[in-house]
């Protein structure tokens, strides 16, 4: 049985939990900062053709559509039909924005070679079967001079201080085992180069929080609503320990998020 986290919801309840998580994280100041940094590196221009690969609820696709304007276009792709339906429900036609086309598709097997000026892929590679193949596929989507932006987390860099470290190590080890590629964030620059792209730029945003409610909105293993991520034997003690550290004001949580941008040679 595949028990990896963040996979497409198999039930209405699972889908609802996933949508709630994505809604919550999209409003978090760290995610907003990461996206602002990525957009600064990309310098999206009016009239460009953009692919959002793994669009989720579509909030970035809508931002990109505003940047490219009516002369540009955005294709928003997601493998999960229910997620794509949710993105469509959230779509609002904005006259000064480019057209958004929503498509069901697998990031690793898209077939629009050379069709885009910009490709955006955020927090997707940690979940795909083969991140290297996925990056090569995304690079093929670019026309000459086109830019690819990949954003992802290095879950091995997740720090939780204020809780017994033996317990923490056990819980975080189990959590990382539920992510297909937990360390992919650190590999982004190398993967862009191996896909034949040039002039890579890498930035890291260190998400730091000293409040449990704030950190739990970004890190699922800290969230009681995701308690199934914690081994049964540790679950009760883990959340009691987090609550106690939080009440004492002794909790520190940190997580590195990487942004990498490179371009296809002209």
Go through each PLM region and give its residues.
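A short glycine-rich, Lys/Arg-flanked "PGG" loop and its adjoining helix->strand segment in the class I
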Residues: 132-147
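A short SAM/SAH-binding and catalytic strip from SAM-dependent methyltransferases
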Residues: 117-131
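A short acidic, Gly/Pro-enriched loop at the edge of an enzyme's catalytic core
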Residues: 109-118
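C-terminal helical/coil "lid" or tail adjacent to the Rossmann-like core of SAM-dependent
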Residues: 2-28, 199-253
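Conserved class I S-adenosyl-L-methionine
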Residues: 1-48, 59-63, 67, 83
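Class I SAM-dependent methyltransferase SAM/SAH-binding core
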Residues: 51-53, 57-109
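Conserved catalytic/acceptor-binding region of the Class I
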Residues: 28, 147-213, 227-231
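Core SAM-dependent methyltransferase catalytic element
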Residues: 195-197, 257-266
